[in-house]
């Protein structure tokens, strides 16, 4: 274990990283939870009133950007470190959520660019926290499991949207605008906690004893 990092510091970092991953890492992949309900609902029912074909095109386009994101955000991670990578990713997600919230079918149909921004930023969130495994040199497998597991848990976010719309009558604008605020809070966490250089761990040098 690197002596300069306390147990509290290491645990706090992995908890924050997993929280960010759950709330931002892979939310696009839970799209099926809202594609047949919230997104189809008319404005009077709290939805944007999108058609099946439009929703299909929207998520196909967003899926493309979710695969493009790691390439470009990975380059940012290599050049500028985890802090800049995470902040950039979170800003894409936040701006995408806000843009989705202010979009509407007749006047400002920007749903495709909005969801594409959310999809683009998601993978960068996970890329920016992978280095946290180095804080746990003796338990890297466990730390990696937490990170990958939290990414998969993010699939539930749109299901939560659907339940809030169905049972509590929150409209899509309130849901996405609120989530934009959550992403802005995540941006602040990234600014405060993530380092400019990834955490590293070097194996202790082997001691060679020569017998003469």
Model-predicted regions and their roles:
Residues 91-105:
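C-terminal ends and interior cores of transmembrane alpha-helices
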Residues 108-125:
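Hydrophobic core of transmembrane alpha-helices in multi-pass small-molecule transporters
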Residues 57-75:
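Central cavity-lining transmembrane alpha-helices of secondary-active solute carriers
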Residues 1-33, 49, 195-198:
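Cytosolic juxtamembrane N-terminal segment immediately preceding the first transmembrane helix
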Residues 78-90:
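Cytoplasmic membrane-interface "Motif A"-like loop-to-helix N-cap segments
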């Amino acid at each position: 274990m690197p002596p300069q990092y306390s147990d509290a510091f290491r645990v706090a970092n992995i908890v924050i990283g997993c929280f960010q991953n759950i709330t931002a890492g892979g939310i696009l992949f839970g799209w099926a939870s809202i594609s047949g309900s919230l997104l189809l609902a008319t404005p009077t029912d709290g939805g944007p009133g999108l058609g099946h074909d439009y929703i299909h095109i929207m998520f196909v386009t967003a899926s493309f950007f979710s695969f493009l994101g790691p390439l470009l955000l990975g380059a940012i991670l290599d050049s500028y470190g985890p802090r800049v990578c995470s902040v950039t990713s979170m800003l894409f997600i936040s701006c995408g959520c806000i843009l989705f919230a202010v979009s509407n079918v007749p006047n400002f149909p920007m749903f495709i660019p909005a969801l594409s921004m959310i999809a683009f930023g998601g993978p960068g969130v996970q890329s920016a926290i992978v280095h946290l495994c180095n804080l746990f040199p003796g338990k890297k497998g466990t730390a990696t499991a937490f990170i990958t597991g939290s990414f998969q848990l993010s699939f539930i976010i749109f299901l939560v949207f659907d339940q809030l719309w169905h049972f509590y009558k929150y409209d899509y604008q309130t849901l996405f605008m609120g989530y934009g605020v959550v992403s802005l809070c995540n941006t602040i966490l990234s600014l405060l906690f993530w380092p400019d250089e990834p955490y590293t761990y070097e194996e202790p040098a082997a001691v060679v004893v020569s017998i003469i």
